Amino acid sequence: MKVQNKWIRAAIPALLLHCSIGTVYCWSIFSQEIADYIGFSKGATEWAFSFAIFFLGMSAAFLGNVVEKDIHRSSLIAALCFAGGMAGTGFFIWYGGNNPGSVLALIGIYICYGFIMGVGLGTGYLSPVKTLMLWFSDRKGLATGLAVAGFGAAKAIASPIMQTLLDSLGDGGIYKMFFILACVYFVMMFVGHLLLAKPEGWHEPTGADKGPG
């Protein structure tokens, strides 16, 4: 029998998921280092972050029905896309370091950090928010606060860790950091995925239940 506790089934998973995906906003910490390592201008690499935010919105808009139907599936999609995109970004940074000025490396970073991680961001944001609202239906302000807290804490917690990794990993530290973080965030998000669950017996209202509108 599954544990039915709003903190275990909603709050903790939300923090695990949001503290992971919220690190997308740490881009400014390492964007210049990526640009220098792969042989492009900082302006060229900045598009990766722009694409990530764009696809965050697009995936949230168009994959909302997946979240509504099955948050367990959507949270798994989020974990796979976010961690996979981060690992892929690390690979193309490594490739760009070995082939300075390679357009393939730059496009690979756009796809991995921008598109793949962007999809993980959108689904990863919606999945716990939906669940929080169900578990904390009488305290929606608290539910919203918990969701925002995870995003806000992500950069504050991850920024010094990322900087320490960059300083300690030496040559090629930038791509090594992405590989390490991909593993860490996958574990965090997968645990969140396993814990995340709607209240037992809850079903999405049908059109008839919602009434005319």
Map each language-model feature to its residues:
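A structural feature recognizing the 12-helix transmembrane core of secondary solute carriers
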Residues: 1-213
